[in-house]
């Protein structure tokens, strides 16, 4: 059983996209430049996979983009120059984390605004319920209701 579990784990690791994404022929000889390339690749969206970075994607376009990033780094471009080049070529969508600019202001502010609005609506609803008396205790039972309840409870106790 342990061998089977170990084989399953090994197979799962080998089949994961992150293991196969960066091919050996893509790796740069300079470790510092390779680290920069990997960091930049994690910030860029695979245009085929949509919500996966090009560092994790096996798509042919992701491979081309990884190679392009490495070419730009080898040519001496800074990280911001590489990102600017790719944004100019593919648009802002290529960035997994869009920049905070006038065009993306709504994207950045919509989440906090919705969260604040939802919290305010919840607070108002709770406040309205407490004012309307919804939290008041129920009125006491009448003698007829108490007798009926006692009869139902004794029937329940007999049947169990």
Swiss-Prot record:
Gene Ontology molecular functions: metal ion binding
Gene3D superfamilies found in the cross-reference section: Cytochrome C biogenesis protein (1.10.8.640)
Signal peptide: 1-21
Family: Belongs to the CcmH/CycL/Ccl2/NrfF family.
Name listed for the protein in its UniProt record: Cytochrome c-type biogenesis protein CcmH
Transmembrane segments: 104-124
Keywords: Cytochrome c-type biogenesis, Heme, Iron, Membrane, Metal-binding, Signal, Transmembrane, Transmembrane helix
GO biological process: cytochrome complex assembly
Chain's role: Required for the biogenesis of c-type cytochromes. Possible subunit of a heme lyase.
Cellular component, GO, one term: membrane
Residues that bind heme: 46, 49
UniProt cross-references to Pfam families, sorted A to Z: CcmH
Cellular compartment(s): Membrane
Membrane topology: Single-pass membrane protein
